[in-house]
Amino acid sequence: MSKINLSTMWSSFIKKIAKTILVAIACISLFLTSSPAANAYPFWAQETAPATPREATGRIVCANCHLGAKLTEVEVPQSVLPDTVFKAVVKIPYDTDVQQVLGDGSKGGLNVGAVLMLPEGFKIAPEDRIPQEWQEELADLYFMPYSEEQENVLLFGPMPGDEYQEVVFPILSPDPATDKSIHFGKYAVHAGGNRGRGQVYPAGNKSNNTTYNVSASGKITDITFEEYVGNQITIETPDSETVVDLVPPGPELLVAVGDTVEAGQVITNNPNVGGFGQADTEIVLQDANRVKWLMAFFALVMLAQIMLVLKKKQVEKVQAAEMNF
């Protein structure tokens, strides 16, 4: 009986191990086969620049893959008080009538993504701190911190661009009274906004959303198209060697059989209709006591002005009385 139980347990254990291995293989296969068609959106920045998405030059790393330049805007209040919730808005405008080249070469709508870099201590507001009137506006939005150590750097997307050309981040300001590492003052805010797929993947290889060049000089002797693979351009060089260049589905060829080309010559159009842009602004973490003292100062100045006016009128009355006398 004991042998039968052990045999059954061992068989069950082997099946579980096999199942786990198969699932792992399937996941790895899915990852490897789908990555070439994946969109290069903000989360790729975590892979290429895990420490910070902003380079020493001030450029956000998303620009390394999204080579087209487009407008992005960021709006934050001029100043905020400690431990308060406010809106930071990143605007990613584009023409919603255009369509981009997808991974398989077909056309489709553009997605958008955003990176918001706030001062240290600022972070996404907890759900219980978000005002009720904001709930509907923020219902379908999901934000992700850049890393566990950087809650002040936030990622959004990809999401459908025709619905999210304005992304509202509900932000909670820090309180220097409870966190001694935070200080009142003026701070920089950086934002990046992307629409559409990138032209280069983080590994450096091209996507099918960019231009393609020939690798050798010579005469094009053949062009063959294979679905899901693309166009194979056969070039006969002056040395009678044969070179075959591959252009994936998406870009349109600008050459034909019989054309003579030079090495490095662009042989496709540029299908990219999207692009990346970044914007910088400032926000002041304001001390409430300073605001109170400032208001008191203004009140004192106004009172002094009123007293001066009254004093002036009093002097004028005295002067008028002396003249009559």
From Swiss-Prot:
Gene Ontology terms for molecular function: electron transfer activity; heme binding; iron ion binding
Task of the protein: Component of the cytochrome b6-f complex, which mediates electron transfer between photosystem II (PSII) and photosystem I (PSI), cyclic electron flow around PSI, and state transitions.
Record text on cofactor binding: Binds 1 heme group covalently.
Membrane topology: Single-pass membrane protein
GO cellular component: plasma membrane-derived thylakoid membrane
Signal peptide from the UniProt entry: 1-40
GO biological-process terms attached to the record: photosynthesis
Record keywords: Electron transport, Heme, Iron, Membrane, Metal-binding, Photosynthesis, Signal, Thylakoid, Transmembrane, Transmembrane helix, Transport
Protein name: Cytochrome f
Binding annotation for heme: Y41, C62, C65, H66
Domain of life: Bacteria
Subcellular location: Cellular thylakoid membrane
Xref: SUPFAM superfamilies: Cytochrome f subunit of the cytochrome b6f complex, transmembrane anchor, Cytochrome f, large domain, Rudiment single hybrid motif
Record has Membrane as a keyword: yes
Keyword Metal-binding carried by entry: yes
Cofactor annotation: heme
Gene label: petA
Pfam families linked: Apocytochr_F_C (PF01333), Apocytochr_F_N (PF16639)
InterPro entries on file: Cyt-f_TM, Cyt_f, Cyt_f_lg_dom, Cyt_f_lg_dom_sf, Rudment_hybrid_motif
Residues annotated as transmembrane: 291-311
Subunit structure: The 4 large subunits of the cytochrome b6-f complex are cytochrome b6, subunit IV (17 kDa polypeptide, PetD), cytochrome f and the Rieske protein, while the 4 small subunits are PetG, PetL, PetM and PetN. The complex functions as a dimer.
